[in-house]
Amino acid sequence: MNLAEELLKAFEGFRSAHGQTEVSAQRTAGKQKAKSYIVRNPLTLELMQSHIDGKQGVGAIPINEDNKCKFGALDIDQYPLDHNELIDKLEKYNVPCIVCRSKSGGAHIFFFFKEWMNASDFRDKAAEISAALGHGRCEIFPKQEQILVERGDVGNFINLPYFDSEQTFRYAIIRREGSYVEASLSQFIEEIQKVQIVPKDFLKIPIGGKVQLYPNYVPCLRSLLDMGIFEGGRNRAAFHLGVFLQKAFPQDWKSKLEEHNAKDFTPPLTASEVVAIQNTLEKKEYNYLCKEEPMSSHCNQSVCRTM
C-alpha cells in the first residue's frame, strides 16, 4: 500500500461521511481560524491523497455506524504546549499512542487499535488517561458513545495530521535514540504499526502508581498524588483532600491528611497550615473544590459519579 492507503486504513471510521476544513491565516485566542463542515460522502483514497498533497484538508469520524471505533484521540487545546513533556508522561504510564502537533500548536494524541472496540469503552479509558495527564477537560474523540444512524447522526470528526505532508506543521513527534524527532509521514505510518493494540489490552493498562495504592480515592486525587502536589495549588489540594478524607475515613482523617502532606506535597505545608485546614473542615461539611485548580485539570467525572 502507498502512504495515502496506509493513512486511510489507520483512520477507518464512519463509512458514509467525513469532515473537511478550510484554514485561514487569521488567529483567534491562539488558534488558527478555520471553517469546518461535514460532507456526507465517504472518505476516499483520492481525498486522502489530496490531504497529503495540501489541496484539501480532511478529517475522519472515529465512531462508526455500530458505535465502535478503531482509532481515537485526545484533543489538547493549550498554547503554548510542551509536546515533549506530554510524551514523557505518556511513556511513564506505558500508554501506546502517538502525539501529533495540531494545526494551532496544541496536541492530538492518537490511539490505534487492531480490532473495533466500543466507543463508550474507549471514552472511559481516554478520560482516565487525560485526567492523569492533567488535561481532564480536553476533548475526546469519538465525542459520542452512541449515534443514531436512522435519524441522520454522523458523529464529530477530528482533523487528520500530515496535511501538505512535505511542509506540514501537523506532524507526529516521536522519540528516536533519546531525542525528539518531527516524524515524516512514512515514519508516522511505521509508528502506527508499533502502537496498535488489542482493545482488551488497552483497557487493562494501569494509569498511575497510586491507582493501586489508593483505589478508592476519587480520580483527581489519585492523579495528583501520583504526580506529587507542588507549590501553586497545595492549599487548595490539601483542602480538597481533607474533604475526601473526612468522608472516607471519619475516625482518622486528620492523621491521614498529615501523612499525605509529608509524603506527597513538595514542599509540605507547614504544621500551622495543616491545622488551619483541619480546624476549618471541622466547623461544617464542605463540598469538593472540583472546579478549582489543580483538581479540575485532573477531573474524570464519569468515574467520580460512580464512587
Residue ranges and their predicted role:
Residues 60-64, 97-104, 139-142:
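Short beta-strand
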Residues 51-60, 90-97, 223-229:
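Short amphipathic beta-strand starts and helix->beta connectors
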Residues 130-168, 190-200:
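Flexible helix-coil linker/hinge segments at domain or subdomain boundaries
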